[in-house]
């Protein structure tokens, strides 16, 4: 299926590893131009070696001023994938100020800032666009030791709807994806304990975790005109976890 992404320009945050990196590669394979944003220079260098033509931007999205400066000169974008996130796991009674500040800065505030920059460019050019926020099943289910992470993703759930409401008149669609555990290299490591994995798998009707391509395919669909009447939605990629 041709998603019509060829020739369009996309910006992807959290592009150095995992879902973000795979999204960059898939967009390039579909013919899009891609700006890849990561805080880790080594990851960007490796990505450019694998996929020449990707435009790398190295910046820590937790730093508002640095982000403003770094993204002010990247040029116009038709598509945006807000994928960058941190997961600092602490039980409620042990949540620290540092965990709150870092998590909300990256998981929520940066989404607002980057989306503002990109959306203002779309509006100034008078072109339609699409934004996909990579959220989590944790946005709608309480998970032990995920107090701050669940809270930031819950806020992102409503932010997605607000962005859709206010950007819709400018022909900018905004949606989110809610993956379950995803088998990125980090995901495979973090969920390698069979007992830990079983506790989560028992809550997933399909009985398996998501592969990276399951999430990436959903992101590309939401970026494409094939989902042209879809905005303000959050699409689970969770094997039925949220149905239980």
UniProtKB/Swiss-Prot annotation:
A molecular-function term among this protein's GO annotations: L-xylulose reductase (NADPH) activity
Modified sites of kind N-acetylmethionine: 1
Residues holding NADP(+): 11-39
Annotated keywords: Acetylation, Carbohydrate metabolism, Glucose metabolism, Membrane, Methylation, NADP, Oxidoreductase, Xylose metabolism
EC number: 1.1.1.10
Tissue-wise expression: Highly expressed in kidney and liver. Expressed in epididymis. Expressed at intermediate level in lung. Weakly expressed in brain, heart, spleen and testis.
GO CC terms of this entry: cytoplasmic microtubule; membrane
Membrane topology, record value: Peripheral membrane protein
Reaction(s) the record says it catalyses: xylitol + NADP(+) = L-xylulose + NADPH + H(+)
Enzyme class: oxidoreductase
Keyword Acetylation: yes
Residues annotated for substrate binding in this entry: 136
Chain positions with Omega-N-methylarginine modification: 21
Subunit (UniProt): Homotetramer.
Designated name of the protein: L-xylulose reductase
Gene transcribed to yield this protein: DCXR
């Amino acid at each position: 299926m041709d998603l019509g992404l060829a020739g369009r320009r996309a910006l992807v945050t959290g592009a150095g590893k995992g879902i973000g990196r795979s999204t960059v590669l898939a967009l390039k394979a579909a013919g899009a131009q891609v700006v890849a944003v990561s805080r880790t220079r080594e990851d960007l260098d490796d990505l450019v070696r694998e996929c020449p033509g990707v435009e790398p931007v190295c910046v820590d999205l937790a730093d508002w001023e640095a982000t403003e400066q770094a993204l002010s000169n990247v040029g116009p974008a038709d598509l945006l994938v807000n994928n960058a996130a941190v997961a600092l796991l602490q039980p409620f009674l042990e949540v620290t100020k540092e965990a709150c500040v870092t998590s909300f800065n990256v998981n929520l505030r940066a989404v607002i800032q980057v989306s503002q920059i990109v959306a203002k460019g779309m509006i100034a050019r008078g072109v339609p666009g699409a934004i996909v926020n990579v959220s989590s099943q944790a946005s709608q289910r309480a998970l032990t030791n995920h107090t701050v992470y669940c809270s930031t993703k819950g806020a992102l759930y409503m932010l997605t709807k607000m962005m859709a409401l206010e950007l819709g008149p400018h022909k900018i669609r905004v949606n989110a994806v809610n993956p379950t555990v995803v088998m990125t290299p980090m995901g495979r490591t973090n969920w390698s304990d069979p007992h830990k994995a079983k506790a989560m798998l028992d809550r997933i009707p399909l009985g398996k975790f998501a592969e990276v391509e399951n999430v990436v395919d959903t992101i590309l669909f939401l970026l494409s005109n094939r989902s042209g009447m879809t905005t303000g939605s959050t699409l689970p990629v969770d094997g039925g976890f949220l149905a239980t």
